[in-house]
């Protein structure tokens, strides 16, 4: 490198270098202890949820009158990807998903636009629709969850204690929000005997009117004096059960209290709403979310202190137990990865001492903490937390960051062995290595560009990978220029008068012969390498496909779905039976149950499901990952045996963006009937695939309904109408909300119903008396034809089309992604080709996300290739040399694919990233070799000798750096997330380095027609 020799400058100003070394190490240690901690990196969930309810409407009616107009309006959302909706009897849930290309800085603007669109449509919805409501905080993570339990305590007592705790936890540092779970709403029921009501000549509507008037909050005005304003407050609101009982009722000349003629009781709502249990005990949950930028470990300690205070104040028998403890999980995860990082440092240092010798190894060992600490400073500056990706990336970069230092140290050592003094050796190392090392470093960093600049949720999840590794590589180059020469000048030792040839030992002689053979038979070597490469690429379809593996976390997410239309009471009984079976099983440490609802998002990689009475969810926490699978399998077997009508599915937490089922295929069509028909055919074909299990559709079977065809003429003659009859039936069967009671911070509905009628059986429906006006009651069967039918109770839609998802699980050794590809490309190929126009079958779930992510990952690849070629061109200055170096890039695929194939590791996101980056590292080695050939030619050597001696001279540093790179990856092998990358890197780099050292000379000699001596 021409110009100022920075190595010489550093040696002459080593006190300045020492100062910065101390400053960097000090700043790095401070940064490390002040970095945020989390288990997984944050990524933006670009989804908002719109909900609405229309009591009494069927799924078909609410789809047509509410879901469809809202979806059409929401199609105007800027940056919209797709809309998915779930419509059930009386309610609809619409998921608005934005494109991954929408910057997270614009998300709040998009949510505001969605609110405006929904508000614009609100006035056009039918009267009686409640909502729509918008939840744009769907990505809130409640990492710390507690359960308040206690035998002998009512739900209301537990709620009050939980509410007090909630208020105190809200003030804890780093707490963003605290929510209560499993709270049972109370309701006041005013029940009257139907005959007694008739004897007073009263109609239900008369009672409604009195309760509504008495319970309404109305302003009574304000008196304005000269000095102040005085508000008038009217007492007598219905704020207690006693005040309701004392409510005066006047019928004609008779007066009495409501409590004299009606039963007034306050109880929990019937039927119950979503329920929570912990270890089988009824519970009220307290869910805590962390503020943005907070530290999980600090939050965990603060919460622990506050909860201990609360426990000491609770009455005997009431307990607070921890359900989810994300700070503890983060602490364990950080500890494991920090241990792996230290292991990698020790391994790399040991390899350095063995390969370079003690004194040279000392130099390298001192360079490592400087670069690592500088990386911590960069991470703190950029706001990159410590998590699975950033720590794993540091381990990955650890092997790479020593490459430049090894090259400089090895070159100084060689020059000292050749007789140069220390300063001259450092100057020669800088002159010969600085520029090619910089080019190689930039090329290696460029290999990771697709990760740093790809769009999409997955790329956002692993985005820190590029920034951490690129900064570490550049910092390592700076350290090799300034720190390595100074430390080498101080520590490297060579025995006085000792001069060793670089070709002295046996390894060099063997390598010399191999190079000579490759040059002699260069065409054979080139063709053979191309054939091996082609054969390896042909193996790709036989390598398992899995974009992100399951994590080692002990949680099992168990979803249990009863037949559509099942009551929450039945779901509760089934979940209680499962809990009884788990109680006492020492393989599990705890389990929390959610009936009629889903667990909150306790980690970012978990998607809550829409509430449904027929659905129950259980989060089982196994004692450790070793017994996790057996606990899952035994629980599923128990459910299949004891509850054959229930459909159970257990999944583990993945190490990437989640999917509900491992295998998902989505069928969309024009109308509900045909879509359901084709989906059943597809599901039957999927079920026939070998090893498939638990195949189901998210479109449940039809549910029974009672249809009443009212005789309009007869009803009108009797003084009634459809509305009055519907309301009367609602009063009898469910209870009609007529007013509200204000009790502290609780709003308790007041409902009116007739005594005993809630227990009516279907068989008695025709004889059920209904009010038709003027105090008259007639049997329902006299004014209506009663029929029993089945109807679709749930409708899923995607982009306005009815959509059914076929789900399942793969058995055997094949990964779910591999099975989906085979199902789609082979099993269902003929089925897809014969679908009518307007009907499509698409991949869904994890593989859809993975294919989309691969497309995003591929988008920046042309930029990556251009930058690599540009750097090559500036460094080598000749197009033929650029082509030779570029050709070697794909050679890394040979070892990478073979390693994945032989070890049965899946090809997924991180392994694809590894292969892209591997190409940059292989090209880097080629640059070093080609640059050395150019230097030897400039020194006047013959072309053949220049090639041979350059390969031999660079053999040691290239192999040393590759071996240390490989050893640096070893601590990543135990991690399911990083294992595919580590395996592909280890195999790919070792084989590519060996092949590159032989193929590059052969390519060079073939192009430039360099021939060696015949005797060689």
Question: Which residues does each PLM region occupy?
Answer:
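Signature of alpha-helical transmembrane segments and their immediate interfacial
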Residues: 1-37, 433, 499-548, 575, ...
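Solvent-exposed, membrane-proximal periplasmic/extracellular interface segments of envelope transport
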Residues: 4-6, 61-137, 195-216, 237, ...
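Extracytoplasmic/periplasmic membrane-proximal domains and adjacent transmembrane bundles
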Residues: 9, 51, 122, 168-346, ...
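Transmembrane helices with small-residue packing motifs
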Residues: 15-16, 23-57, 119-128, 380, ...
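Hydrophobic transmembrane alpha-helices and their membrane-interface caps
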Residues: 30-34, 346-413, 471, 867-954, ...
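Flexible hinge/switch segments at interdomain interfaces of large molecular machines
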Residues: 37-48, 85-91, 128-151, 179-185, ...
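Helix-loop junctions and hydrophobic alpha-helical segments within the transmembrane domains
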Residues: 323, 330, 334, 409, ...
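Transmembrane alpha-helices and their membrane-interface boundaries in multi-pass membrane transporters
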Residues: 398-412, 434-453, 460-499, 618, ...
């Amino acid at each position: 490198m021409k110009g100022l020799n920075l190595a010489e400058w550093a040696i002459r100003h080593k006190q300045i270098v020492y100062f910065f070394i101390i400053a960097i190490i000090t700043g790095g240690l401070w940064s490390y202890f002040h970095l945020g901690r989390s288990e997984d990196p944050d990524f933006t969930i670009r989804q908002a949820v719109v909900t609405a309810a229309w009591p009494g409407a069927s799924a078909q009616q609410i789809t047509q009158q509410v879901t469809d107009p809202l979806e059409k309006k929401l199609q105007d959302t800027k940056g919209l990807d797709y809309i998915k909706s779930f419509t059930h009897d009386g309610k609809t849930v619409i998921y608005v998903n934005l494109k991954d290309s929408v910057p997270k800085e614009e998300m709040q603007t998009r949510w505001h636009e969605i609110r405006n669109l929904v508000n614009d449509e609100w006035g056009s919805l039918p009267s009686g629709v409640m909502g729509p409501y918008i939840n744009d905080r769907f990505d809130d993570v409640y990492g710390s969850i507690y359960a308040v339990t206690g035998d002998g305590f009512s739900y209301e007592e537990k709620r009050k204690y939980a509410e007090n705790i909630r208020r105190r936890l809200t003030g804890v540092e780093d707490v963003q929000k605290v929510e209560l779970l499993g709270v049972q709403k109370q309701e006041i029921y005013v029940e009257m005997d139907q005959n007694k009501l008739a004897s007073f000549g009263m109609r239900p509507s008369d009672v409604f009117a009195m309760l509504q008037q008495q319970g309404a909050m109305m302003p009574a005005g304000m008196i304005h004096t000269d000095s102040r304003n005085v508000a008038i407050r009217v007492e007598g609101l219905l704020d207690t059960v006693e005040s309701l009982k004392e409510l005066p009722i006047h019928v004609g000349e008779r007066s009495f209290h409501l409590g004299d003629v009606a039963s007034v009781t306050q109880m929990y709502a019937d039927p119950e709403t979503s329920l929570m249990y912990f270890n089988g005990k009824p519970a009220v949950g307290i869910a805590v979310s962390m503020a943005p930028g907070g530290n999980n470990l600090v939050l965990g300690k603060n919460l622990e202190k506050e909860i201990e205070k609360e426990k000491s104040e609770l009455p005997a028998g009431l307990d607070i137990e921890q359900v989810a403890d994300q700070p503890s999980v983060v602490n364990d995860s950080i500890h494991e990865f920090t241990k792996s990082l230290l292991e990698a440092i020790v391994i790399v240092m040991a390899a350095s001492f063995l390969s370079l010798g003690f004194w040279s190894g000392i130099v390298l060992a001192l360079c490592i903490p400087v670069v690592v600490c500088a990386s911590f400073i960069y991470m703190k500056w950029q706001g990159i937390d410590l998590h699975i990706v950033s720590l794993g990336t540091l381990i990955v970069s650890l092997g790479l960051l020593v490459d430049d230092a090894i090259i400089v140290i090895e070159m100084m050592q060689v020059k000292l062995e050749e007789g140069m003094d220390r300063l001259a050796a450092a100057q020669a190392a800088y002159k010969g290595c600085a520029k090619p090392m910089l080019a190689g470093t930039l090329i290696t960093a460029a290999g990771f560009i697709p990760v740093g600049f790809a769009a999409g949720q997955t790329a956002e999840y692993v985005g820190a990978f590029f920034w951490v590794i690129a900064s570490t590589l550049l910092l390592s180059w700076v350290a090799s220029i300034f720190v390595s020469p100074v430390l080498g000048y101080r520590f490297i030792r060579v025995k006085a008068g000792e001069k060793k040839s670089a070709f002295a030992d046996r390894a060099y002689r063997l390598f010399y012969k191999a190079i000579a053979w490759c040059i002699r038979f260069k065409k054979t070597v080139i063709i053979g390498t191309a054939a091996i490469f082609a054969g390896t690429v042909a193996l790709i379809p036989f390598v398992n496909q899995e974009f992100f593996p399951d994590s080692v976390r002990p949680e099992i997410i168990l979803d249990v779905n009863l037949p559509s239309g099942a009551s929450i009471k039945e779901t509760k009984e089934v979940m209680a039976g499962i809990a009884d079976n788990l109680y006492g099983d020492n393989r599990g440490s705890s389990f929390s149950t959610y009936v009629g609802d889903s667990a909150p998002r306790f980690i970012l990689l978990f998607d809550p499901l829409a509430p449904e009475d027929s659905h129950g969810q259980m989060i089982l926490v196994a004692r450790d990952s070793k017994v996790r699978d057996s606990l899952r399998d035994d629980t599923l077997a128990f459910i299949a045996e004891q509850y054959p009508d229930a459909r159970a599915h257990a999944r583990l937490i993945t190490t990437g963006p989640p999917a509900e089922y491992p295998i998902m295929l989505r069928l969309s069509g024009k109308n509900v009937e045909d879509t359901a028909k084709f989906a059943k055919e597809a599901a039957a074909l999927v079920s026939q695939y070998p090893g498939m299990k638990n195949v189901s559709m998210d479109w449940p079977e039809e549910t029974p309904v009672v249809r009443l065809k009212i005789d309009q003429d007869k009803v009108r003659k009797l003084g009634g109408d459809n509305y009055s009859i519907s309301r009367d039936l609602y009063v009898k069967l469910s209870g009609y909300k007529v007013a509200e009671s204000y009790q502290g911070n609780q709003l308790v509905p007041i409902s009116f119903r007739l005594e005993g009628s809630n227990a009516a059986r279907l068989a008695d429906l025709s004889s059920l008396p209904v009010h038709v006006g003027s105090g008259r009651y007639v049997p329902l069967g006299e004014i209506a034809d009663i029929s029993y039918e089945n109807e679709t109770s749930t409708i899923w839609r995607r982009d306005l089309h009815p959509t059914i998802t076929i789900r399942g699980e793969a058995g055997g050794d094949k990964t779910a992604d591999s099975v989906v590809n085979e199902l789609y490309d082979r099993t269902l190929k003929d089925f897809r080709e014969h679908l009518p126009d307007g009907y499509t079958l698409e991949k869904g779930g994890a593989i859809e996300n993975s294919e989309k992510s691969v497309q995003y990952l591929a988008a920046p690849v042309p930029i990556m290739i251009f930058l690599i070629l540009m750097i090559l061109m500036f460094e080598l200055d000749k197009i033929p040399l650029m082509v030779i170096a570029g050709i070697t890039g794909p050679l890394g695929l040979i070892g990478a694919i073979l390693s994945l194939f032989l070890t049965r590791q899946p090809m997924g996101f991180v392994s694809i990233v590894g292969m892209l980056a591997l190409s940059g590292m292989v090209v880097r080695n080629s640059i070093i070799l080609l640059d050395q050939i150019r230097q030897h030619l400039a020194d006047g050597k013959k072309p053949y000798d220049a090639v041979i001696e350059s390969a031999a001279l660079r053999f040691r540093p290239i192999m040393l750096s590759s071996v240390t790179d490989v050893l640096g990856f070893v601590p990543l092998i135990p991690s399911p997330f990083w294992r595919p990358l580590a395996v592909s890197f280890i195999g790919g780099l070792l084989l590519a380095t060996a092949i590159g050292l032989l193929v590059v000379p052969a390519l060079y000699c073939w192009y430039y027609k360099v021939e060696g001596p015949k005797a060689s």
